């Protein structure tokens, strides 16, 4: 009688001790294993059900490493199999005098994901991790279902990138996560490389591959090595090869990775959409986790295609024959314009504009997501500084620069006679640009050009 009475009780207890199918499938674990790209131990972590769609997350510079993903990991692990790790040189992984480059990191991630994920995955990268993720998607496109880039660092040419941080005081950026390490990117690219290049032309790609250089000059510091390798990596031909749906998320107050990089990537990637987090810094995904998650979730579900490229003409605006800015500061100009004349103006922003011809004199101007198309010379500059992002300039001569400095990113120059002429010496820094002229047949251009009188591009 006692046996029959106790049987239901034991059955209930036994049922409670047997894990549910969902629980049994969870693989929340942390471990170390040997890797053969850098020759050390790598810290790995998984969360969630491996039968679910997979998400791989790549962190940026700094010993915080993969701990930056804590909130996102917990939000995703119910519906996704999440795989994270500390990149070698950071966090709990081995630190040594190795070449911590985007290409080598991509090789490592491919090996790890092949072993522990085993199927195409959604790839998310922040800061340097965004640059690594871009390199990875280019190198191993079959592995990636969607790409998410968060405040990606180091994509622009190093001269444009270092110039962005140079004017900022330490006090203005120290309150941002990981900034001390992120600043080393610019310290190295600016101070070290400029100093060396002034002495003699050097091949920095060759030097950074040498163990004695990394040991003596970079003191075997992983952050210094990774930072220098990042700004040396040439991303100029990569964006056009990325066909995965790409979500680009940026804090609009980021003082570490210039927001213009986001506009450039949105312009150049075939299927990309840029979302800004208002008042967000370099780690807006930590500062605004709910808003970040609201953007990320639909992207991972692929419930929409990334935003299409804008129409060739801006939506706004009635056509204005002539617009002038004279001796003003902080002026914003947009819309469809015949002739735009800017003289003695500072901090002018031209955005989402279509212009027939533009003349800038004694001014500082930023131009974004705009086109200048002319039957003659499209853009003339005299004694001015011009920053162009995600643009198109076309004419008999695209740009005529006189004693001016131009920083041109993600922009195509088309000139039936010349892309650039300079009656007076002018300096142009190109990042992920294109030139189509009698001298250059629609080529990618990435680097600095000094154009002297009589010379042209």
Task: Please annotate each region the language model reported.
Residues 242, 248-250, 254:
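Short beta-strand/loop motif that positions the catalytic acidic residue
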Residues 208-235:
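Hydrophobic, aromatic-rich cap/lid helix
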Residues 322-324, 338-343, 356-362, 375-382, ...:
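Glycine-rich beta-solenoid repeat tracts in large extracellular/virion proteins
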Residues 280-293:
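Catalytic histidine-centered segment of alpha/beta-hydrolase-like enzymes
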Residues 138, 147-187:
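Flexible "cap/lid" loop of the alpha/beta hydrolase fold
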Residues 84-124:
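Active-site loop/oxyanion-hole signature of alpha/beta-hydrolase fold enzymes
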Residues 2-56, 77-81, 119, 154, ...:
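Alpha/beta-hydrolase fold catalytic core
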Residues 47-92:
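Conserved HGGG/HGGXW glycine-rich cap/lid loop of the alpha/beta-hydrolase fold
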